[in-house]
Amino acid sequence: MATEKTPDWKIVDLQWAPDLGPVPVQDAMRPTRESQGEQEMIARMWVMCAIQMQDKLCAAKCTKQHFERYRSWLTAEYERFKQPGYPQVPDSRELVDMSNDARLAAMNKLREGVKNTYMWPVIEGPWRVYDNVVDIVEGRVKLVKVLLQDGLLEKFYDWANGLSEVRPLFNRMGRSNSSLRILEIGAGTGGTTARALEGLKSDDGELLYSSYEFTDISPLFFDAARRRFEGYSNIEYRALDISRNAVEQGFEAGAYDLVIASNVLHATPCLVDTLKNVRLLLKPNGFLFNQELSPPGKYVDFMVGLLPGWWLGDADGRAEGPCIPPEEWHRRLEQAGFEGLHAVGFDSDPPYYYNANMIARPAVNA
């Protein structure tokens, strides 16, 4: 039986508009820097934190089912650490064999080395999970509160969004239609919003959009976002749960030229249903920009696997975690009435990439 050939996404060209012609993916969504060293440091930190907290997590009394899922997942990873060739941490077996004191000293050395640098949030994040895990699973503190302290979560998202340069993508789109109606899903701390808005300016500072709707499932982030983006006009802040029909939540069907989603669509129970809800919002010639986690490593699983939403995809073929590779996004987009993936750009070469930046548009007559 013949197997379907996986497309070489990096050489796909994207036609924005007749006046622009083809936009090569590597020009519109390119890595900002060589990140191999960063990714290896991050992987080493989370693996050491995972090993260090294994015993106390096993002894803790989990108060929620998703905490039990996390504990089972981490126990399985711990067994993999003992085998040679763990991704990005080839000496994981030696890290397991270290004494607790030596491992703790190595963890603190990494933390000290990145203080006051852009790497601080991605090294401090795993430490906070390790340091607070018993209080989290026994219900005395919430993970989100732990990660929000000192602006860590916002700085973490800024680091992740800074791995790839997508501002030219939004700028080219804005130049082809300076009256864009844009909706961002799950905008959260505004890391992607900031880069989109920076790109949606002409050379003389004119805004290249008519409206920008900043949405999130909760209004928790809205006050901070209003302060962060007070210098921009025509931004509206609204609550939206994209796992539900958006029209029933007061949004207009077929109204948006561009929908932006950064690491949010995976956190829903059924991706095809969610993508159908996204398609409902788009104009027939509109675009979805979907930035999604696609890392070979398990850093993100370690960081946010204690959140209930991380395990929502059990019945959707995502029992081991919510993230899927671009080939699978392509298939599910087609099932939801899109043409599939129009283009994909990664923020680094394998196996050191973190995000996949994906563009899709509605299928005609779907």
Curated annotation (Swiss-Prot):
Instruction: Tell me yes or no: is Iron among this UniProt entry's keywords.
Output: no
The EC category is: transferase
List the pathway annotation: Secondary metabolite biosynthesis
Give the induction annotation: Expression is induced in complex medium (Czapek yeast autolysate medium) supporting calbistrin production.
Binding site residues for S-adenosyl-L-methionine = T189, D216, N245, A246
List the InterPro entries hit by this protein, alphabetically. Methyltransf_12 (IPR013217), Polyketide_Synthase (IPR050444), SAM-dependent_MTases_sf (IPR029063)
Instruction: Note the Pfam families from the entry.
Output: Methyltransf_12
Superkingdom field: Eukaryota
User: Which processes are annotated in GO (biological process)?
Assistant: biosynthetic process; methylation
**What is the role of this chain?**
Methyltransferase; part of the gene cluster that mediates the biosynthesis of calbistrin A and related compounds. Calbistrin A is a secondary metabolite with an interesting structure that was recently found to have bioactivity against leukemia cells. It consists of two polyketides linked by an ester bond: a bicyclic decalin containing polyketide and a linear 12 carbon dioic acid structure. The polyketide synthase calA is probably responsible for forming the decalin moiety.
Q: How is this protein named in the record?
A: Methyltransferase calH
Source organism lineage?
Eukaryota, Fungi, Dikarya, Ascomycota, Pezizomycotina
As recorded in Swiss-Prot or TrEMBL, the protein's gene is named calH
